[in-house]
Amino acid sequence: MTAPVALRDPAVISAESDTLRPAAKSGSAFHQGARDALRWLLVGGPGPLTGGITGLPIPLRAVVAELSAAEAVIYGRPSGRRDYAMGLEHALMWAELATETAPTTARGSERSTRQ
């Protein structure tokens, strides 16, 4: 068994996920990817990109697999899932305290127009 990931407080992650809901529902792929990542960290289940099933607490290897899958989409062949992967990657990095910029204030969805 691998160690769980050190994350922000679950209440903070949940609040950010709730704040992302309107933008995600309006069709922002970046915000949908971010919200899916945060919900996955809170409840487990299939990984948003890999589909790998995980329970709680989410093991580090599962987060690394999702980040790797996101990187493959972002830097791989042009894809309609690029913005989604960028949102997922940003949210996981934020939840892991690797960046201070929350997904709701990130500019990823505005800058990504390449497909």
Name what the model sees in each region:
Residues 13, 17-20, 31, 35-38, ...:
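Generic L/I/V-rich hydrophobic alpha-helical segments across diverse proteins
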Residues 71-115:
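Amphipathic alpha-helical binding modules
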Residues 3-18, 56-70:
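Short amphipathic alpha-helical heptad-repeat segments
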Residues 21-31, 47-50, 73-85, 101:
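Charged, low-complexity interaction regions
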Residues 3, 10, 28, 60, ...:
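Amphipathic alpha-helical coiled-coil segments with heptad-repeat character
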Residues 1-6, 113-115:
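Eukaryotic intrinsically disordered, low-complexity tracts enriched in Ser/Pro/Thr/Gly and charged residues
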Residues 24-68:
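Amphipathic alpha-helical interaction modules
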